[in-house]
Design a protein with these regions (language model features):
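RNase H-like (RuvC/DEDD) metal-dependent nuclease/polynucleotide-processing core
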Residues: 2-243
């Protein structure tokens, strides 16, 4: 539900954790002021541009989608992805899929995308390629004051005090492991975790809540970024993952 501003300055700022979902983007938002965070009911918003145009505007949008892409394929992907795998270690490192190069976004088939990616593209990234293209189309460098690439597994690593989680996120034990951490560390998390939305899974709700937790860290300027000295893509976008 959108808050009415009536031209007045709000006593809080809006934060959002965003993950791709069927029918659009799952948004877990919260009102934030100082030490207080109040999660709102999650919702699915159809297009990413509508999140950017949301009123009142989000102070931070932490999105689980690559921002900044290579022009040519590179073994093991962007430096931020290689660094993220190093941080997570085995076996959770496998959760970090390499982003496709920009040329792959125009592919109409998986085979074309694989060729544009230098012969390798994970099926996960192919399923996400339309979402990656949607973000790449609208993100300009100035948006990176507000919009940040995050990864839920890195968020959970931080939530668990620099400890990788034990179970894959889509298994029942993995879902419960993540819910337990979120309930302990994110005040009001149940409002997100207990939601029922068509086409949205429990693991997606967990991911969105974890991204929201990182959005609060970004707003509070306690976040770290991978790598510390990021690369820039051909469009002037920083290629980094924050946690």
């Amino acid at each position: 539900m959108r808050a009415a501003t009536h031209g007045a300055q709000l006593p809080y700022q809006l934060l959002a954790g965003v993950v791709p979902a069927r029918g659009g983007w799952l948004v877990a938002s919260a009102k934030w002021q100082g030490a207080t965070i109040a999660p709102q009911e999650p919702e699915v918003i159809g297009e990413f541009i509508d999140i950017l145009d949301y009123k009142p505007a989000y102070r931070v949008i932490a999105v689980f989608t690559p921002i900044g892409l290579l022009e040519e394929p590179r073994a093991k992907g962007r430096s931020c992805e290689r660094e993220a795998r190093r941080v997570l270690g085995v076996p959770r490192a496998s959760a970090i899929a390499s982003a496709p190069p920009r040329a792959a976004l125009a592919a109409s088939t998986y085979e074309e995308a694989v060729e544009a990616s230098g012969g390798h593209l994970s099926p996960i990234r192919w399923r996400q390629i339309a979402k990656i293209a949607e973000v790449d189309k609208v993100i300009a460098p100035y948006w990176q004051r507000t919009v940040f690439e995050v990864h839920p597994e890195l968020s959970f690593f931080q939530l668990a005090e620099d400890r990788p989680l034990r179970y894959p996120k889509r298994t029942q034990v993995g879902i419960e492991e993540r819910e337990e951490i979120l309930r302990a560390r994110l005040p009001g998390a149940e409002r997100i975790l207990g939601a029922t939305l068509p086409g949205v899974s429990k693991s997606q709700l967990n991911d969105a809540a974890a991204c929201l937790w990182t959005a609060r860290r970004i707003a509070a300027r306690t976040v770290s970024r991978l790598p510390e000295d990021p690369e820039w893509d051909a469009l002037g976008l920083r290629m980094e993952i924050v946690r």
